[in-house]
């Protein structure tokens, strides 16, 4: 009888018993990422443990390292909110001097990456350190009280962007750090989502094997900050892809004219010119994604705000070179 090989290693680097909220999508992302990176190191260097982690202050750092305990089964350093990329750069330089082979994994949330740590990230990428930077994007400063970040999407409720008579909630468009990273013309940039775990694992393995800097921005659901059912995290993350809210793409060597778009699924029709995706007709409206999250509840009393978000999503796809057709619920 044939034995089916599991899609990912059974080795664990993220132990149970951590203090993350029930249904935390970021915990799922870090568990998968470390397992995938372990596989990449085994395939490239013959050593599954050939990596070390520099982890910025944030949700996942706090819940995984409540002194004197730790959930990490790999070399791991807790660093300041803003300097995961800088510390990872130093570790990489030391390993190079010692002749030690492997990959350094830097981990930061959207606050510690898109805002506070953006300068350190840019420097790390520009200096061409052999570091994989993983941005786990739950779209707000969840650890410190659900404050908005520059990665918070338009219309979302946070404690610092509360909706009201004169406010729609967050009134700025989302910052796509992956595109900023790609502007450094580094070997590899990708977006991912826990709603498509196999795609995420593939991208982490690919990023891990590359010589030089790599950047992966993964969407992680947060039931606490998103006011969503804790058991629906993966479903919500998948709907983000299927409605067009969250694009899955890869950019290699800064070639923004040859962005590799992954099909969103969900019944969407994808049109290509050669190998390049030029048009996607989405079947599911963005309302299917929004309605499962309390942070967007107020938008259903403001149809003009939902329309503005729809236009922002179209504009984001246009930057990627894709015409996005986003349906409305009645269509």
Curated annotation (Swiss-Prot):
<dbReference type="InterPro" id="IPR011766">
    <property type="entry name" value="TPP_enzyme_TPP-bd"/>
</dbReference>
<dbReference type="GO" id="GO:0051539">
    <property type="term" value="F:4 iron, 4 sulfur cluster binding"/>
</dbReference>
<keyword id="KW-0004">4Fe-4S</keyword>
<feature type="binding site">
    <location>
        <position position="222"/>
    </location>
    <ligand>
        <name>[4Fe-4S] cluster</name>
    </ligand>
</feature>
<keyword id="KW-0560">Oxidoreductase</keyword>
<comment type="subunit">
    <text>Heterotetramer of one alpha, one beta, one delta and one gamma chain.</text>
</comment>
<feature type="binding site">
    <location>
        <position position="24"/>
    </location>
    <ligand>
        <name>[4Fe-4S] cluster</name>
    </ligand>
</feature>
<dbReference type="GO" id="GO:0046872">
    <property type="term" value="F:metal ion binding"/>
</dbReference>
<dbReference type="GO" id="GO:0019164">
    <property type="term" value="F:pyruvate synthase activity"/>
</dbReference>
<keyword id="KW-0479">Metal-binding</keyword>
<keyword id="KW-0411">Iron-sulfur</keyword>
<protein>
    <recommendedName>
        <fullName>Pyruvate synthase subunit PorB</fullName>
        <ecNumber>1.2.7.1</ecNumber>
    </recommendedName>
</protein>
<dbReference type="InterPro" id="IPR029061">
    <property type="entry name" value="THDP-binding"/>
</dbReference>
<dbReference type="Pfam" id="PF02775">
    <property type="entry name" value="TPP_enzyme_C"/>
</dbReference>
<dbReference type="GO" id="GO:0030976">
    <property type="term" value="F:thiamine pyrophosphate binding"/>
</dbReference>
<feature type="binding site">
    <location>
        <position position="21"/>
    </location>
    <ligand>
        <name>[4Fe-4S] cluster</name>
    </ligand>
</feature>
<keyword id="KW-0408">Iron</keyword>
<feature type="binding site">
    <location>
        <position position="59"/>
    </location>
    <ligand>
        <name>[4Fe-4S] cluster</name>
    </ligand>
</feature>
<dbReference type="InterPro" id="IPR051479">
    <property type="entry name" value="PorB-like"/>
</dbReference>
């Amino acid at each position: 009888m044939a034995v089916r090989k599991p899609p990912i290693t059974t080795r664990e680097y993220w132990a149970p018993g951590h203090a993350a909220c029930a249904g935390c999508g970021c915990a799922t992302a870090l568990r998968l990422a470390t397992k995938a990176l372990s596989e990449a190191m085994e395939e490239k260097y013959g050593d599954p443990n050939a990596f070390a982690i520099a982890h910025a202050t944030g949700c996942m750092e706090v819940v995984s390292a409540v002194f004197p305990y730790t959930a990490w089964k790999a070399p791991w350093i807790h660093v300041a909110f803003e300097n995961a990329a800088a510390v990872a750069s130093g570790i990489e330089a030391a390993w190079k001097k010692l002749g030690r082979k492997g990959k350094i994994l830097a981990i930061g949330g959207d606050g510690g990456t898109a805002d506070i740590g953006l300068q350190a990230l840019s420097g790390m990428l520009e200096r061409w350190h052999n570091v994989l930077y993983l941005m786990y994007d739950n779209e707000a400063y969840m650890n410190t009280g659900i404050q908005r970040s520059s990665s918070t999407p338009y219309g979302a409720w946070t404690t610092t962007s509360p909706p009201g008579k004169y406010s729609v909630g967050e009134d700025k468009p989302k910052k796509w750090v992956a595109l900023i990273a790609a502007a450094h013309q580094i070997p590899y940039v990708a977006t991912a989502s826990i709603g498509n775990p196999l795609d995420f694992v593939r991208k982490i393995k690919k990023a891990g094997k590359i010589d030089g800097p790599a950047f992966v921005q993964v969407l992680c659901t947060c039931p606490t900050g998103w006011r969503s059912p804790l058991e629906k995290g993966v479903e919500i993350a998948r709907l983000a892809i299927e409605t067009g809210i969250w694009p899955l793409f890869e950019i290699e060597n800064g070639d923004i004219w040859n962005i590799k778009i992954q099909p969103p699924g969900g019944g969407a029709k994808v049109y290509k010119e050669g190998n390049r995706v030029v048009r996607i007709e989405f079947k599911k409206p963005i309302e299917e994604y929004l309605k499962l999250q309390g942070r967007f509840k107020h938008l259903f009393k403001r149809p003009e705000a939902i329309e503005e978000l729809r236009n922002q999503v179209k504009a984001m796809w246009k930057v990627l070179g894709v015409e996005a057709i986003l349906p409305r619920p009645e269509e």
